[in-house]
Amino acid sequence: MTGRDSASSDITPEVLLRAYACGIFPMAESVDDPTLFWVEPERRGIIPLDGFKVASRLARTVRSDVFTVSVDRAFKQVIDGCAAPQPGREDTWINRRIRELYIGLYQLGHCHSVEVWQNDDLVGGLYGVNLGRAFFGESMFHRARDASKVALVHLVARLIEGGFVLLDTQFVTEHLRTFGATEVPRRRYRAMLDVAITGAADFARLPTEQPIAGTRALAIISGREGLGRG
C-alpha cells in the first residue's frame, strides 16, 4: 500500500515517528523528486534477532577488526553515502527532504548510524530509526568489501545487548536473506510492532564512545556474552 503526499514539507520528524508506530514509512521516487510517498508493504521484511546468521568468512573479517566501527560519529556522512550511487544501484530514493527528516530524527535521538572506517576513511555504514524496542533499518552502503556487512553485525550485537525485539528491514533482498531476513504478513508484522514499541530499549547499552571488538560483537550474537539482559 502506498500513498503520495505532495505536501511533504508538512511532514515533521514527530509525524515520521507516529508513522513508524503505525507501520508505514516514507520514500521518494528519486533524488530529484521533491515529494514523498508512504509505504506499507503487504509483506514486511524483518531479521529475527535470535536467528541472525553470520557466514564463516564474514565472521573472520569481523573478528580480525580490520575495520574500526563507531556509532553516531558521522551520521550525515553515512546518509550521504547511502544516497550516493552504488554498484548495481544507480538511483536513490533518498532525496533532500528524506535527508532533512532523518537528520531531524537523529537530533531527537531517534535515529542512529553505524560507521565503518579504514584508517581515517569512511568505507561503509548504515542508519536507521529506533522507537521503543524496535529498530527500523533504512539504508546501508559500502566502499570497501564487507564494510556494510560488518556494520550490520555490529548493529545486531548492539540491538541484542540493548534489549530490542524487532529489526525491521522493510523489504527483503537476496543479500539480506543470507543474514536470516524473512518476510511476514502485514497483520503479523503489526502485532510484532505493537509489542516492540511498548517498553524501552537502550541503543547505548554497549559503549558508543569507543569501538567494540569484533570478537565481543560475535559473542553477543551467539549468546556467549551478556551484561545481565533481562
From Swiss-Prot:
<dbReference type="GO" id="GO:0030163">
    <property type="term" value="P:protein catabolic process"/>
</dbReference>
<dbReference type="GO" id="GO:0005737">
    <property type="term" value="C:cytoplasm"/>
</dbReference>
<keyword id="KW-0808">Transferase</keyword>
<comment type="similarity">
    <text>Belongs to the L/F-transferase family.</text>
</comment>
<dbReference type="InterPro" id="IPR016181">
    <property type="entry name" value="Acyl_CoA_acyltransferase"/>
</dbReference>
<keyword id="KW-0963">Cytoplasm</keyword>
<dbReference type="InterPro" id="IPR042221">
    <property type="entry name" value="Leu/Phe-tRNA_Trfase_N"/>
</dbReference>
<dbReference type="InterPro" id="IPR042203">
    <property type="entry name" value="Leu/Phe-tRNA_Trfase_C"/>
</dbReference>
<comment type="function">
    <text>Functions in the N-end rule pathway of protein degradation where it conjugates Leu, Phe and, less efficiently, Met from aminoacyl-tRNAs to the N-termini of proteins containing an N-terminal arginine or lysine.</text>
</comment>
<keyword id="KW-0012">Acyltransferase</keyword>
<dbReference type="Pfam" id="PF03588">
    <property type="entry name" value="Leu_Phe_trans"/>
</dbReference>
<protein>
    <recommendedName>
        <fullName>Leucyl/phenylalanyl-tRNA--protein transferase</fullName>
        <ecNumber>2.3.2.6</ecNumber>
    </recommendedName>
</protein>
<dbReference type="GO" id="GO:0008914">
    <property type="term" value="F:leucyl-tRNA--protein transferase activity"/>
</dbReference>
<dbReference type="InterPro" id="IPR004616">
    <property type="entry name" value="Leu/Phe-tRNA_Trfase"/>
</dbReference>
